[in-house]
Amino acid sequence: MSITKEQILEAISEMSVMNVVDLITAMEEKFGVSASMSINSNNHNEKDLREEKTEFDIFLKVIGPNKVSVIKTVRSATGLGLKEAKDLVESAPTVLKENISKEDAESLKKTLEDVGAEIEIK
């Protein structure tokens, strides 16, 4: 007769805390593993999987009261023509620039916020 995983879990759930600690210690010795070691290695792997973001998008949420200044700033930042920059700004909420460095994104955000736009970096 084979014992199922559910039966093992049910038996463990009925044990006292001290008996569970003894069981863990016995399993560590029998299989040559350490419960604390696996926890640390899992945390290390999670840190490796999380990459630091290097490219950002500038998202125009709200134009603000100074539409002309926002259009001029967007035009100079994107290299678009006047009509294209105006159309882009008027389509807010929208992405203004994609895949730019963190420094460039923060600089553009500050410039646009200074002229009254509401900006989000994603």
From Swiss-Prot:
Name by which UniProt lists this protein: Large ribosomal subunit protein bL12
GO biological process, one term: translation
Pfam families xrefs: Ribosomal_L12, Ribosomal_L12_N
Molecular functions per Gene Ontology: mRNA binding; structural constituent of ribosome
Family from the record: Belongs to the bacterial ribosomal protein bL12 family.
Keywords: Ribonucleoprotein, Ribosomal protein
NCBIfam families reported for this sequence: L12 (TIGR00855)
Role according to the record: Forms part of the ribosomal stalk which helps the ribosome interact with GTP-bound translation factors. Is thus essential for accurate translation.
Keyword Transferase: no
Gene Ontology terms: cellular component: cytosolic large ribosomal subunit
Superkingdom of source: Bacteria
Signal peptide: none
Subunit structure: Homodimer. Part of the ribosomal stalk of the 50S ribosomal subunit. Forms a multimeric L10(L12)X complex, where L10 forms an elongated spine to which 2 to 4 L12 dimers bind in a sequential fashion. Binds GTP-bound translation factors.
